[in-house]
Amino acid sequence: MYRLIYAFFYTLSLLPMWCLYRLSDMGFVLIYYILRYRRNVVKSNLTSSFPEKSQEELKAIERKFYRWFADYFIESVKLLSISKEELSKRLTIINANHIEECFKEGQDCAGILGHYCNWEWLSCIGISLPSDRKIGLIYKPIRNKTIDKLFYQLRSCVGGVPVPKNEILRYLVQYRKEGVRSLFGYISDQSPRWQNIHLWLPFLNHETPVFTGTERIMRKMNNAVYYVEMNRPKRGYYTCEFHLITKDPQSMPEHEITRQFFKMLEQSIKNQPHLYLWTHKRWKRTKEEFDSRFIIENGKVVPK
């Protein structure tokens, strides 16, 4: 089954971008008007995140989001066959020299990012760095094994190293032992399970539960930490810029890296709100319900 699915998407990826975007236009009509894919969730998220905006403004953001969402899928499929030359034209790394400077100083780097713009393309930022550097993206495996394998393939097509989130420490330690410099991206805006909630932060007009494990890894490995900001100046073209949070994570107050990341991500989203992934129930767990059901004892979340 996987071979058939891969063959289909690989063949699809061979089409030129202008042709793929025509397919994306049709995909937008399908998911927005016909399937109405998670439109209630998207509308609810936008309304609660931007109470200051009018219904007309929210509707415009919603439509632009679904157009981008269709593009996201097509652009991700394109990674299966895109050449490094074309990718270099479409993905501009603004300040990769900052990362290379850290590498030359003997320090590995960590990039922290959200589900904003086309994060799949970030596995390709190694095109702007020497080939002996390891560049990768930590991901949560998809339950459907066939789809998971397909995404693993597209994330590794241009030299990226996809790593399941539960295995990242093993990879980091191994690369360090081998003297290989690495930059890994951590998508850190997911909603944690109840038992993993140790911090709530204001984010997009919500009291939001956030993961703290990413920060613990960065402290343990003493990585230089950057917020990775993508932008989309026009269709099919992205920029990537690294914003330094700290080169000395162990000296920062607990959770400060996480706090700064969410402030930066929120500002990016406010600049171009249609480029955030609004289809997930990001705020399904509330602080009120958490306080009524759980307490924290010795650093662990336990039922009352």
Set out the residue ranges of the language-model regions.
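Alpha-helical segments flanking ligand/cofactor-binding loops in enzyme cores
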Residues: 100, 124, 215-216
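Membrane-anchoring hydrophobic helices of lipid-metabolizing enzymes
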Residues: 1-113, 118, 148-149, 153-154, ...
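Catalytic core of membrane glycerolipid acyltransferases/transacylases, capturing the structured
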Residues: 105-166, 193-202
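Non-catalytic C-terminal accessory region of glycerolipid acyltransferases
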Residues: 53, 60-63, 128, 132, ...
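Short capping/connector residues at structural and topological boundaries
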Residues: 85, 92, 96-98, 121, ...
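An N-terminal domain-start capping segment
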Residues: 17, 21, 138-144, 189
